[in-house]
Amino acid sequence: TSGKAAKKAGKAQKSITKGDKKKRKESYSIYIYKVLKQVHPDTGISSKAMSIMNSFVNDIFERIAAEASRLAHYNKRSTITSREIQTAVRLLLPGELAKHAVSEGTKAVTKYTSSK
């Protein structure tokens, strides 16, 4: 290898050991995209729309978690089970949306339990 290449390689190595690694930003975007392709295979999504969807998923997640936590606390329980999650969903989501969410959730839990 030439001197320049060796210098570059050395620099790259140095920056890694210094801890200049890019911070990972977690998001639901790959899952949102997979669901989009299931319901509308020929539809795309802009990065701004994806960001909004990601915020929406995070918001709903936090609301359900907080409500489930409250329910567990009211009933002097220290564990959040699928029952608390289901009740939280019923309390947070309106009518038909809650029914569909509960049935999808039940389906997912059943699938997970049977695969174990």
Curated annotation (Swiss-Prot):
An annotated GO BP: defense response to bacterium
PROSITE patterns per the UniProt record, alphabetical: HISTONE_H2B
Region (Disordered): 1-25
Compartments, record wording: Nucleus; Chromosome
Keyword annotations of the record: Acetylation, Antibiotic, Antimicrobial, Chromosome, DNA-binding, Glycoprotein, Isopeptide bond, Nucleosome core, Nucleus, Ubl conjugation
Location of N6-acetyllysine modifications: K4, K11, K14
SUPFAM superfamilies: Histone-fold (SSF47113)
Pfam families registered for this protein in UniProt: Histone
PANTHER family per UniProt: HISTONE H2B
Function (record text): Core component of nucleosome. Nucleosomes wrap and compact DNA into chromatin, limiting DNA accessibility to the cellular machineries which require DNA as a template. Histones thereby play a central role in transcription regulation, DNA repair, DNA replication and chromosomal stability. DNA accessibility is regulated via a complex set of post-translational modifications of histones, also called histone code, and nucleosome remodeling. A mixture of histones H2B and H4 has antimicrobial activity against the Gram-positive bacterium M.luteus.
Protein's name in the database: Histone H2B
Organism listed in the record: Penaeus vannamei
